UniProtKB/Swiss-Prot annotation:
Signal peptide residue numbers: none
Biological process, per Gene Ontology: tetrahydrofolate interconversion
ATP-binding is among the record's keywords: yes
Keywords: ATP-binding, Ligase, Nucleotide-binding, One-carbon metabolism
Name of the protein described by the UniProt record: Formate--tetrahydrofolate ligase
GO molecular function: ATP binding; formate-tetrahydrofolate ligase activity
Binding, ATP: T73, P74, L75, G76, E77, G78, K79, S80
HAMAP family reported for this sequence: FTHFS
SUPFAM superfamilies: P-loop containing nucleoside triphosphate hydrolases
């Protein structure tokens, strides 16, 4: 049954839907799981992925469906809602369907954007658990990451306080001689805390640590989160963690978690994190939640492990990429699928009339502020101009060889004439297009959308990567900039050029993925520029090295690894009932 999403808040819909949500033992029977494959945690459960994959190794994979979007407004365009709506629509068509989504960060949940639990009748439940820590994965990652920082700062203190002979006699450790000006790692916390971007630590005496500048980043930007998204099993996870570069010594040599003898203990914190959590749509389709890296500063995907499990357990598996096709889909295409060896059947491009109007020259959209009337009343001229961004993204998807399906995530203020413009432009660009009212009506509102995806899945495709791994780093970046972003070329800073030359000449980085770091609010590096800008070049100021995740991250423009909390954050409206413990105000 569909709830009245125009009168009920998301948390209220979740509360009602949870009354009939399958419990772990019911999911076990429904999904055909063995008892030992389900690790119950209250009314949620984790799945022992290795046991499931081994048991179902000979079973053919289901259809692999990715969901992306056009360049969004700061409000987001409903990719999670669309992903869940598609699961519900396919379920309403009688299909065996499930999906995989990322775990939300506490930062955006308590800030402006909200939980990423979907919305209306296309919602992930139970919403409170999803929004407030779930089964502890992000907490495990914070503990593991910060243990690495504890190991490094303690080592620096002891090496300062003891000479070589004392260090060997008292601790059995060799001197690492870490350069305090070349520490790559910082501390992490799962909030948007701009006051922690630049800090000084170790104030006090010789037993109070090592005095130096330091920093905090948001937890989901941690390399450990990126590793969780791409790891294949616990052994792979442990190896990658040990390879993380935490700093450089005074001779310029990398210092890793293995050098600090802390990598194995960090992996121990994540022994259960490796298993995905099973949740439910509001219409009771299964959905795995696993990993939660940001897309503009990391890989922006749910885990490879979750996709491998889902493709074995159901016939249609839906997964979401962060932000727009230029960022999230590009990383799904050239990084996630390259690492996993999985080939998708369809990519869904989520579009809203609101975002298209913004790209057509509409007034500025500001999170937390009321929308201008241009976005809530018919304006065909803005839509007509704005569809160029959608057409560009369709072209990006088609370069991969995947069949694109445009989903018009329809709001109740959109008009038929506006939607007709979008459909005409999408079909002219070679994509199927369907409108969907899943927010309002759940699966019944997504039938046209589900049918388009089913049809697209039955067609063959010629999926291939944008570039071979043999291509040099700077050539890869140039290809991404020109063919995905629409740039005229790339301008490298002297520092970035020197680092790129070093990386290109060192064979150990030859198989590292290229992970672009760029704003999600524009095809360019400048978040102000909307639509499909022409006559611009992409500046690369630095290249970050994630030696554990095996990413090389060229940075376009300035991106902070620690977002800030805005002036009207969501936490002001979140409350808990002392009598029942029920949480209200989440969205």
């Amino acid at each position: 049954m569909a709830y009245d999403a125009t009168k009920m808040a998301d948390w209220q819909i979740s509360e009602e839907a949870e009354k009939n949500m399958p419990m772990p033992e019911e999911w076990c029977e429904k999904l055909g799981l063995e008892k030992e494959e389900m690790l119950a945690m209250g009314r949620l459960s984790k799945l022992d992925f290795l046991k499931i994959i081994k048991r179902l190794e000979a079973k053919p994979d289901g259809k692999y469906i990715e969901v992306t979007a056009i360049t969004p407004t700061p409000l987001g365009e409903g990719k999670s809602t669309t992903s869940l709506g598609l699961m519900e629509g396919l379920g309403a068509r009688g299909k065996s369907v499930g999906g995989a989504l990322r775990q939300p960060s506490g930062g955006p949940t308590m800030n402006v954007k909200g939980t990423a639990a979907g919305g209306g009748n296309s919602l992930l439940i139970p919403m409170t658990e999803f929004s407030l820590g779930l089964t502890g994965d992000i907490n495990d990652i914070m503990n593991a990451h910060n243990l690495g920082m504890v190991a490094m700062t303690a080592r620096m203190q002891h090496e300062r306080n003891y000479n070589d002979e004392q260090l060997q006699r008292l601790t059995g450790m060799r001197r690492l001689d870490i350069d305090p000006t070349r520490v790559e790692m910082g501390w992490i916390i799962d909030f948007c805390a701009q006051a922690l971007r630049n800090i000084v630590i170790g104030l006090g005496g010789r037993t109070d640590g090592y005095t130096m500048q330091s920093k905090f980043g948001i937890a989901v930007g941690s390399e450990l989160m990126a590793i969780l998204a791409v790891a294949t099993d616990l052994a792979d996870l442990k190896e990658r963690i040990n390879n993380i570069t935490v700093a450089f010594d005074k001779s310029g040599k990398p210092v890793t978690c293995r050098d600090l003898e802390v990598g194995n203990a960090m992996a121990a914190f994540m022994r259960n994190t490796i298993n995905p959590t099973l949740m439910s749509t509001a219409e009771y389709q299964p959905c795995l939640v696993h990993a939660g890296p940001f897309a503009n500063i990391a890989v922006g995907q749910s885990s490879i492990i979750a996709d491998r499990v889902g493709l074995k357990l159901w016939d249609y598996h839906v997964t979401e990429s962060g932000f727009a096709a230029d960022i999230g889909f590009e990383k799904f295409w050239n990084v996630k699928c390259r690492f996993s060896g999985l080939k998708p059947h369809v990519s869904v491009l989520t579009a809203t009339i609101r975002a298209l109007k913004m790209h057509g020259g509409g007034p500025k959209v500001v999170a937390g502020k009321a929308l201008d009337d241009a976005y809530t009343k018919e304006n065909l001229a803005l839509v007509e101009k704005g569809v160029e961004n959608m057409v560009h993204m369709i072209g990006v998807i088609r370069k991969s060889g995947i069949n694109p399906v445009v989903c018009v995530n329809r709001f109740y203020t959109d008009t038929d004439a506006e939607v007709a413009i979008v459909k005409k432009a999408a079909e002219a660009a070679g994509a199927r297009c369907a409108e969907s009212k899943h927010w309002e009506k759940g699966g019944e509102g997504a039938l046209e959308f589900a049918d388009a995806v089913i049809d697209a899945c039955e067609e063959g495709n010629d999926f291939d990567f944008l570039y071979p791994l043999e291509m040099k780093l700077r050539d890869r970046v140039d290809k991404i900039a020109r063919e995905v972003y629409g740039a005229d070329g790339v301008d490298w800073s002297p520092e970035a050029t020197a680092k790129a030359e070093m990386l290109e000449n060192d064979p150990k980085y030859a198989d590292f993925a290229t992970m672009m770091v760029k704003t999600h609010l524009s095809l360019t590096h400048d978040p102000v520029k909307k639509g499909v800008p022409k006559g611009w070049r992409l500046p690369i100021r630095d290249v970050l090295i994630y030696s554990g995740a095996k990413f090389l991250c060229p940075c376009a423009g300035t991106i902070s690894l620690m977002p800030g909390t805005g002036s009207n954050p969501a936490f002001r409206r979140i409350d808990v009932d002392p009598a029942t413990g029920k949480v209200s105000g989440l969205f």
